[in-house]
UniProtKB/Swiss-Prot annotation:
<dbReference type="GO" id="GO:0000287">
    <property type="term" value="F:magnesium ion binding"/>
</dbReference>
<dbReference type="InterPro" id="IPR006195">
    <property type="entry name" value="aa-tRNA-synth_II"/>
</dbReference>
<dbReference type="InterPro" id="IPR045864">
    <property type="entry name" value="aa-tRNA-synth_II/BPL/LPL"/>
</dbReference>
<keyword id="KW-0460">Magnesium</keyword>
<feature type="binding site">
    <location>
        <position position="247"/>
    </location>
    <ligand>
        <name>Mg(2+)</name>
    </ligand>
</feature>
<keyword id="KW-0963">Cytoplasm</keyword>
<dbReference type="Pfam" id="PF02912">
    <property type="entry name" value="Phe_tRNA-synt_N"/>
</dbReference>
<keyword id="KW-0067">ATP-binding</keyword>
<keyword id="KW-0030">Aminoacyl-tRNA synthetase</keyword>
<dbReference type="InterPro" id="IPR004188">
    <property type="entry name" value="Phe-tRNA_ligase_II_N"/>
</dbReference>
<dbReference type="Pfam" id="PF01409">
    <property type="entry name" value="tRNA-synt_2d"/>
</dbReference>
<keyword id="KW-0648">Protein biosynthesis</keyword>
<dbReference type="GO" id="GO:0006432">
    <property type="term" value="P:phenylalanyl-tRNA aminoacylation"/>
</dbReference>
<dbReference type="GO" id="GO:0000049">
    <property type="term" value="F:tRNA binding"/>
</dbReference>
<comment type="subunit">
    <text>Tetramer of two alpha and two beta subunits.</text>
</comment>
<protein>
    <recommendedName>
        <fullName>Phenylalanine--tRNA ligase alpha subunit</fullName>
        <ecNumber>6.1.1.20</ecNumber>
    </recommendedName>
</protein>
<dbReference type="GO" id="GO:0005524">
    <property type="term" value="F:ATP binding"/>
</dbReference>
Length: 339
């Protein structure tokens, strides 16, 4: 039986076959188990001798089973590793890469420029009241911007802000001069949508207030902005313009070489010295809130520009509507670009 059992163990091709051999010899009804159960029927001397033989046989079978099991497990593992082996020379599976929206990229570029100049960066509410959006910014009731055809009005008398300037008022109410701040966010205009106009777009607006702030400071700031966007040799032009919340007001443009080899002045935004009526309105709001009047007699400048226009020119996007169409063919071109 010993030779038969050991041979069967060595010839077992896999673990299930080895388990069958174990059951055949050492199971509850196995050959060795039955022999051990029959020892009680033998005379004492023969029982002792036969018992020693069967115990030695069982130990030999157990040892052979353990050794063969280790061999078969190792062989099974080797076979599995061979079948599941990774060829490290094959190219990996690339995961889809995300990227910043072009508007976000331009915003980040602008914010970095102003943070280098020491500006705080804030955002404000998109739903505004009429006073902060118009009256506090020296936009009287008869001004065309307050026409129902130009503004999204809500049923409760509030509106979707038409510019980010209301946050300038809110910031001055909460902070005393001197201050330097830029405001970023969405604004809304009730106008027809076309390649260059949307009813929702973005603005970045800046405000500086202190003692002796002049138009020269404003020009220096805009020039630094232009250099940050278009390089150290960027040229800036100012032209007189009208905005109710600044006096004097101006539009600013940079000399731009487009990808087609053309050079021209590119208008970026508007700016000017903060109108005294705005400072007066801010102090009125501060006084109503129990705060001291600190802005009358101060000077400051403000400026604003649209990230969409910069992004359209920078990336050659011909239609502003592409930014918000959720077209993967457009946005997918910016995968992996994280600023």
């Amino acid at each position: 039986m010993r030779e038969e059992a050991l041979q069967a163990i060595q010839e077992a091709p896999d673990l299930p076959a080895l388990q069958a051999v174990k059951t055949r010899y050492l199971g509850k009804s196995g050959l060795v188990t039955r022999e051990l159960g029959a020892l009680g029927k033998l005379p004492p001397e023969e029982r002792k001798r036969r018992g020693a033989e069967l115990n030695a046989l069982r130990q030999a079978i157990d040892a052979a089973l353990t050794e063969r099991e280790a061999v078969l497990k190792r062989a099974a593992l080797d076979a599995r590793l061979a079948s599941e082996a990774i060829d490290v020379t094959l190219p990996g599976l690339s995961l889809p890469a995300g990227g910043l929206h072009p508007i976000s990229r331009v915003y980040d570029d602008l914010i970095r420029i102003f943070e280098r100049m020491g500006y705080a960066v804030v955002e404000g509410p998109e739903v505004e009241d009429e006073h902060h959006n118009f009256e506090a910014l020296n936009v009287p009731w008869y001004h065309p911007a307050r026409d129902l055809q130009d503004t999204f009005w809500l049923e409760d008398g509030r509106l979707l802000r038409t510019h980010t300037s209301p946050m300038q008022v809110r910031y001055m109410v909460d902070h005393e001069p001197p201050l330097k701040v830029v405001v970023r966010g969405k604004v809304y205009r009730y106008e027809a949508t076309d390649a260059t106009h949307e009813s929702m777009f973005h603005q970045l607006e800046g405000l500086v207030v202190g003692d002796g702030i002049s138009m020269a400071d404003l020009k220096g700031t805009v020039a630094e902005l232009a250099r940050g966007l278009y390089g150290p040799s960027a040229k800036v032009r100012f032209q007189p313009s009208y905005y109710p919340f600044v006096e004097p007001g101006a539009d600013f443009a940079v000399w731009w070489d487009n990808p087609r080899g053309e050079s021209k002045w590119l208008e970026l935004g508007g700016c000017g010295m903060v109108h005294p009526n705005v400072f007066r309105a801010v102090d009125d709001l501060r006084e109503a809130a129990g705060k001291p009047r600190v802005y009358e007699g101060k000077t400051g400048f403000a400026f604003g520009l649209g990230p969409e226009r910069i992004a359209m020119l920078k990336y050659g996007i011909p239609d502003i509507r592409y930014f918000y169409a959720n077209d993967p063919r457009v946005i997918g071109q910016f995968r992996g670009e994280l600023g």
